[in-house]
Regions:
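Metal-dependent de-N-acetylase/amidase catalytic core
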Residues: 2-18, 25-30, 35, 39-182
Length: 182
């Protein structure tokens, strides 16, 4: 097997590759995709000290550019590759202005407790502050649940139950989009 740091770098490179290849299966051109390359479980530390670089825990790296090699365009964080909250915000602002999305879909912190997902949502909201482009709709979803890491459960092509509501004070509305084979 690989050494731990080498395995972590390989996993990151595979994720970068997936971020380009998987959308292509759906007909999304590479020029519309970007990999940010920030490190797993480091977003809370980045948020706590916005101008301080936060290196990878596993990959022995402190430069995000290794994982951006497939990007078709440069982002602000590519200037120094520093994994900081401020670079993340600058990257998000650049992507939002480039894509001008009408809809943004994010993990919802009330139903997805993963610390990186919570911080990613906070980063998008912070990046949107004062930005000349604003989406018309923001949707939330759960990738991880509070009590387990196995949701959504079930067989491929089966229906998926809605995630449980953990905070009754929130107004969460289900959204289901019908897909065709085309």
């Amino acid at each position: 097997g690989l050494e731990r740091a080498e395995a972590a770098r390989l996993k990151g490179r595979l994720r970068a590759w997936d971020s380009i290849v998987v959308p292509r299966w759906a007909g999304v051109p590479e020029a519309h995709c970007a990999q940010l390359g920030y490190f797993c479980l480091q977003l809370p530390a980045m948020q706590a000290a916005p101008d301080q670089p936060v290196a990878s825990r596993e990959a022995q790296l402190s430069d995000t550019r290794l994982f951006r090699q497939f990007n078709a365009f440069l982002l602000p964080g590519d200037q120094d590759g520093s994994p900081t909250w401020n670079n993340l915000l600058a990257d998000l602002r650049a992507l939002i202005l480039r894509a001008r999305p009408e809809v943004i879909v994010l993990p919802h912190p009330s139903i997805d407790p993963h610390p990186d997902h919570i911080c990613a949502q906070a980063a998008v909201f912070e990046a949107l502050q004062g930005l000349e482009w604003q989406p018309t709709t923001i949707l939330g979803y759960a990738n991880h649940l509070h009590d387990n890491d196995r949701w959504p459960m079930g067989n491929s092509a089966d229906g998926i139950a809605l995630p449980p509501v953990f905070d009754a004070s929130l107004s969460l509305y289900p959204c289901s989009v019908l897909l065709s084979l085309d």
